[in-house]
């Protein structure tokens, strides 16, 4: 279960992924080894899923962001489709959703030509009956930071 110190550690790591353990320890009034032990526990328990650098796509030649709604005609093709999306580097996210589409994909492509090629490949996946694409013109907010409510502490355990 998470306690208030765990939440403080998580907030710090979300804001500053490269924060030094000694700095975090000072913020939460623990020793660096105690903070390291807590971070390891958060990793082992799957609370912290990993560490990554957030790269601006435009600076590395990924100029087009799009969301693609994908309809799958048959229930038995859902898992196969999701598994195949793991093979596409330009597909950043693949979510099984409710509504008219079966999946929503977030993609970043080099240009519209690369997006068109990717769409063709996605449409050729067995079971795909339709795609709807929304190209992003501008982004007002894009974040990976989760708000962590203090009610997640003991006595208010999260449900899986």
Regions picked out by a protein language model, each given a short descriptive name:
Residues 1-160:
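A compositional/biophysical signature of low hydrophobicity enriched in polar/charged and small residues
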């Amino acid at each position: 279960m998470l306690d208030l110190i765990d939440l403080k550690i998580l907030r710090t790591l979300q804001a500053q992924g490269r924060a030094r353990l000694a700095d975090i320890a000072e913020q939460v009034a623990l020793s660096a080894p105690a903070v390291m032990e807590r971070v390891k526990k958060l990793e082992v328990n799957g609370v912290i899923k990993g560490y990554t650098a957030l790269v601006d796509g435009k600076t590395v030649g990924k100029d087009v962001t799009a969301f693609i709604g994908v309809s799958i005609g048959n229930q038995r093709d859902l898992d196969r489709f999701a598994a195949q999306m793991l093979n596409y580097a330009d597909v950043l996210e693949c979510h099984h959703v409710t509504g008219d589409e079966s999946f929503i994909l977030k993609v970043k492509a080099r240009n519209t030509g690369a997006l068109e090629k990717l769409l063709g490949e996605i449409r050729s996946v067995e079971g795909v009956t339709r795609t709807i694409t929304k190209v992003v013109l501008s982004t007002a907010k894009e974040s990976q930071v989760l708000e962590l409510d203090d009610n997640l502490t003991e006595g208010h355990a999260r449900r899986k």
